[in-house]
From Swiss-Prot:
Catalytic residues identified in the record: 67, 116
Full protein name: Isopentenyl-diphosphate Delta-isomerase
Keywords: Cytoplasm, Isomerase, Isoprene biosynthesis, Magnesium, Manganese, Metal-binding
Required cofactor(s): Mg(2+); Mn(2+)
Pathway involvement of the protein, from the record: Isoprenoid biosynthesis; dimethylallyl diphosphate biosynthesis; dimethylallyl diphosphate from isopentenyl diphosphate: step 1/1
Protein's organism: Shigella sonnei (strain Ss046)
Binding site for Mg(2+): 67, 87
Domain Nudix hydrolase: start-end pairs: 30-164
Role description: Catalyzes the 1,3-allylic rearrangement of the homoallylic substrate isopentenyl (IPP) to its highly electrophilic allylic isomer, dimethylallyl diphosphate (DMAPP).
Main location: cytoplasm
The protein's assembly and partners: Homodimer.
Length: 182
């Protein structure tokens, strides 16, 4: 895969430039554009993934299915499809917006900061998974209600962005409706 960049944003969310992805994520990460996706199978189960130990931020942490950064000239939806293919080797239905104005800042225990405008999407898988071990060390298909209960009971076991997304009542409602619509 070619070198990825992040699209830097000002406080109003307007693009101001780009920076190489790994150089962008530091203890003083600038606001940038990202996306987050929750993938479901035909049974309505959510794919929860565990980040590879080689990841710069939150290694080994359980999270929602796939996250990433759109590239210049790429729509968020196309970026979701690209990263699903790269990380999971999977084809998906067109991504649907779940939480378009999600924005967060969180600091990893090693000091790396995420500072993102991060629209959230849901999609269904349409092929078998072919996991990229450089990205994902483990995965599990789970009932959404069980995952949400786990997040509520043990938020420290999940990525902060997943916890914050699940805490939004409208996003939770839309994810539940998406999971039930087979």
């Amino acid at each position: 895969m070619q070198t990825e960049h992040v699209i830097l944003l000002n406080a109003q969310g307007v693009p101001t430039g780009t920076l190489e992805k790994y150089a962008a994520h530091t203890a003083d990460t600038r606001l940038h554009l990202a996306f987050s996706s929750w993938l479901f199978n035909a049974k309505g189960q959510l794919l929860v993934t565990r980040r590879a130990l080689s990841k710069k931020a939150w290694p080994g942490v359980w999270t929602n299915s796939v996250c990433g950064h759109p590239q210049l000239g790429e729509s968020n939806e196309d970026a979701v499809i690209r990263r699903c293919r790269y990380e999971l080797g999977v084809e998906i239905t067109p991504p649907e917006s779940i939480y378009p104005d999600f924005r967060y800042r969180a600091t990893d225990p090693n000091g790396i900061v995420e500072n993102e405008v991060c629209p959230v999407f849901a999609a269904r898988t349409t092929s078998a998974l072919q996991i990229n071990d450089d990205e994902v060390m483990d995965y599990q298909w789970c009932d959404l209600a069980d995952v949400l209960h786990g997040i509520d009971a043990t938020p420290w076991a999940f990525s902060p962005w997943m916890v914050m997304q699940a805490a939004n009542s409208e996003a939770r409602k839309l994810l539940s409706a998406f999971a039930q619509h087979n």
